[in-house]
Amino acid sequence: MKVRIDRSETLFSGKFLSCRKIFYTDARGIARHWEAVDRTGNPGCAHAVFIVARIVPDNEVVLIRQFRPPAGRAMVEFPAGLIDPGETPETTAIRELYEETGFEGKVLSCTAGGYSSPGMTGESIVLAAMEIDGTCYPDGMIPQNHQEESENIEVFRVKIGELAEFVKAMEAEDCGIDSKIYTALTFQSFGW
């Protein structure tokens, strides 16, 4: 027997998120339920994009730090943002990189939408690989960003070979670290 979704009940719906209870029948025929949080808007499409932006020839990656109320602390993350209706992931990546960091770059590739935390949400996120021309931002320059009024984003240029040390320093400052950064560090430790 295949797993079957029987019905879904919305418990709460807000501007950006909704919470629902999903009733399903598992592979053994047992009726079960699950609580989930979903993004609102853009049904059937990816909801957000996160950006791995490499500054060349400096071999640096752009990271941000901002307070995240659900985590209750400052988080170190890759730049990211929601895909607006009518936008492509590429357009969103260019816009969000500029708004959050002030950097302008070109999109090298975008993945299909992947799931950020499939045990909790159906949110689909696209990874945008971007390249920034470091000659436009010499001597470690960080341009003025264009963040929204509600944001308080700090921007970092981190040498790829120094990423592990940077993460340790941020942990020592009691910052949370986005799991995507730990994934990048793990791949780096494998020599990939």
Residue ranges and their predicted role:
Residues 62, 77, 127-129:
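Conserved beta-strand segments that form the floor/walls of ligand-binding pockets within enzyme
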Residues 70-76:
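A conserved beta-turn-beta hairpin within the catalytic core of GNAT-like acetyltransferases
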Residues 56, 61-64:
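Glycine/small-residue-rich phosphate/adenosyl-binding loop
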Residues 176-192:
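Short, amphipathic C-terminal "tail helix"
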Residues 11-52, 57:
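Acidic, metal-coordinating catalytic segment for phosphate/diphosphate chemistry
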Residues 38-40, 66-70:
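Short, solvent-exposed aromatic-acidic interface loops
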Residues 48-50, 81-175:
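Unchanged
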Residues 2-12:
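Short amphipathic beta-strand and strand-loop transition segments with alternating hydrophobic
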